[in-house]
Amino acid sequence: MGGTELDEMYFQSLSIAEVKLIRPRKFGDCRGYFSEVFREKWFRKNVADVGLVQDNESLSAQIGTVRGLHFQLEPFAQGKLVRCTRGALFDVAVDVRVGSPTYGKWVSAELSQENGAQLWVPAGFAHGFMTLKADTVISYKVTAPYSAEHDRGLKWDDPAIGINWPKMTTYVLSEKDSSQPSLCELPVSFQYVKV
């Protein structure tokens, strides 16, 4: 885990090293708490040296709502810094970089209003989430603006990927997310470049 006791934020690489879990510190007293949730210089030094150009937010009213798995093609490929500002969600990143040693593998983290954790999902990964509470709000910063022409997706429950989604009695998906291609049907979108 990166960071020192003097830092306001800690981070750790998940089992796919490019995906990072960030935990901002909370400073509390009788009034509540204060937390610095983003500092560009710290982020560029410790997580990814990229610019974040747009903030997005979505509300999912029902528990078991699935959004994803989404990504965008170059030149509008998006890295995403994701946080949950109300409720809780199961957040997932899937490596779609052809040639990567972790191609088709996934990592996840639970993000919630309570834990304040954030997930960095770099370009070259499909991103999605499932709400664990009703009226969950997700907020995320992205490295490129939305482009409908470059918008792509991946089947959320593809058995070849095998995401261990939380069990729900029902899942709420859009028609678009219900009809995304599986990994084996996905055209080459990103090539892995070893650094």
From Swiss-Prot:
Binding-site residues for substrate, renumbered to this chain: 31, 36, 54-56, 67, 80, 127, 151, 176
InterPro entries: RmlC-like (IPR000888), RmlC-like_jellyroll (IPR014710), RmlC_Cupin_sf (IPR011051)
Entry's Gene Ontology molecular function annotations: dTDP-4-dehydrorhamnose 3,5-epimerase activity
Keyword Kinase among record annotations: no
Top-level enzyme category: isomerase
UniProt pathway: Carbohydrate biosynthesis; dTDP-L-rhamnose biosynthesis
Site (Participates in a stacking interaction with the thymidine ring of dTDP-4-oxo-6-deoxyglucose): 146
Keyword Protein transport included in the entry's annotation: no
CDD domains in the record: cupin_RmlC
GO BP annotation list: dTDP-rhamnose biosynthetic process; polysaccharide biosynthetic process
Active-site residue numbers: 70 (proton acceptor), 140 (proton donor)
The reaction(s) this protein catalyses: dTDP-4-dehydro-6-deoxy-alpha-D-glucose = dTDP-4-dehydro-beta-L-rhamnose
Stated role: Catalyzes the epimerization of the C3' and C5'positions of dTDP-6-deoxy-D-xylo-4-hexulose, forming dTDP-6-deoxy-L-lyxo-4-hexulose.
Protein name, UniProt field: dTDP-4-dehydrorhamnose 3,5-epimerase
Organism field: Sinorhizobium fredii (strain NBRC 101917 / NGR234)
